[in-house]
């Protein structure tokens, strides 16, 4: 088995050097190959996560969210049984992030957060897209670190600026089999609601979200 895997890895490197395989697809296939040999264990005895989040616009305030054992188990359970397709896993990601936002809202003022940037005075806990995308990226990184993602990888935050005064940020994932990127956008919704996930090309053009 190990010899066959080494041969397959060598062929993939050869295809990459010849330009017949893009770097994104190479690393995606390499990760899938590694998972097929030793899938990441979701260890029940690992320490509970401590998640740094921010809020109050442009990450003006920070806090550390510490899920209880019961809360974290509910997050992990969103990925059971394992997703049979990338589409199914994206739905799991939506539910898990919604749950993590709810947990954060129990420990911080972010339970007050409303979709977009409403006009609020003296309203601690409201988040702009910088806060939201930063937190979403951290949630995604946690899910990846704990071995919960099999069809996707986490990459840098997505950014768009179609107009000078219309900058926007979101979390971002890449589908490993295809190399397709998706924005994970929580800013449009109230705290604790499943974020929108949209193909990055559509998100860059501000197309309507698929489930809006």
Where are these regions (language model features)?
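N-terminal secretory signal peptides that target proteins for export/translocation
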Residues: 1-23
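Bacterial N-terminal signal peptides
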Residues: 27-36
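Short N-terminal segments immediately surrounding and downstream of signal-peptide cleavage
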Residues: 44-61
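N-terminal, post-signal-peptide region of Sec/Tat-exported proteins
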Residues: 70-104
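Mid-length scaffold segments of soluble, non-membrane domains
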Residues: 97-152
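Hydrophobic/aromatic-rich core segments of domains that either
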Residues: 141-203
């Amino acid at each position: 088995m190990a010899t066959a895997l080494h041969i397959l890895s060598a062929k993939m490197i050869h295809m990459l050097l010849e330009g017949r395989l893009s770097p994104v697809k190479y690393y995606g296939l390499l990760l899938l190959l590694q998972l097929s040999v030793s899938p990441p264990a979701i260890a029940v005895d690992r320490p509970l996560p401590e998640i740094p989040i921010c809020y109050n616009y442009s990450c003006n305030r920070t806090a550390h969210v510490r899920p209880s054992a019961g809360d974290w188990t509910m997050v992990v359970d969103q990925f059971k049984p394992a997703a049979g397709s990338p589409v199914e896993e994206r739905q799991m990601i939506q539910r898990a992030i919604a749950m993590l936002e709810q947990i954060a809202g129990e420990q911080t003022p972010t339970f007050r957060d409303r979709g977009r940037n409403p006009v609020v005075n003296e309203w601690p806990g409201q988040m702009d897209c910088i806060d939201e995308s930063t937190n979403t990226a951290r949630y995604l990184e946690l899910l990846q670190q704990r071995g919960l993602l099999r069809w996707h990888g986490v990459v840098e935050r997505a950014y768009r600026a179609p107009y000078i005064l219309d900058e926007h940020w979101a979390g971002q994932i890449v589908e490993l089999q295809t190399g397709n990127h998706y924005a994970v956008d929580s800013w449009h919704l109230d705290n604790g609601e499943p974020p929108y996930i949209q193909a990055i090309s559509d998100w860059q053009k501000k197309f309507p979200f698929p489930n809006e």
